[in-house]
Amino acid sequence: MEIEKALGEVAETPAKWSRNGGTKNHNFLKKRIKPGTIRHLEYDLLDVEIGESWPIPVSVVHGSRPGPVVTLLGAVHGDELVGPLALTYLCGANFMGDDRLIDPSVLAGTIRIVPIVNLPGYRRRSRYFPDRRDLNRSFPGNPDSNTTSRVASGVWKN
């Protein structure tokens, strides 16, 4: 009975997804991504003056129509190799077949694709960050804490 009642109700589309208002630019890492475009950016996992900042690639597919924002993360554990492969394939030219990319002109919403989050772990084929902490257990993180927690905080906020 409850299921039938729920099926009878019409869910409204959130106002921010309304197609009447048009799509606005998507802001990510202080960059503006125009509707109907794909941008490839680099994100520094750490804000450091000395040492490596661990830059990782981020692809943003911003649809021409309003919709949700979805972030896909791979290699949160550096020893898990299927996620980076799948997300790299998703960004590739043959994902839609016949040398076709994802078409942002027909997409509603935004997809942010990050094939490798745990870059140091991925390079060493290790689940953990160099400080022996598990990134997956560190979210939402703390910008004033250990390395893993700082990275988790940056990924969470962006």
Which positions does each model-derived feature cover?
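Structured catalytic-domain cores with a bias toward divalent-metal coordination
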Residues: M1-N158
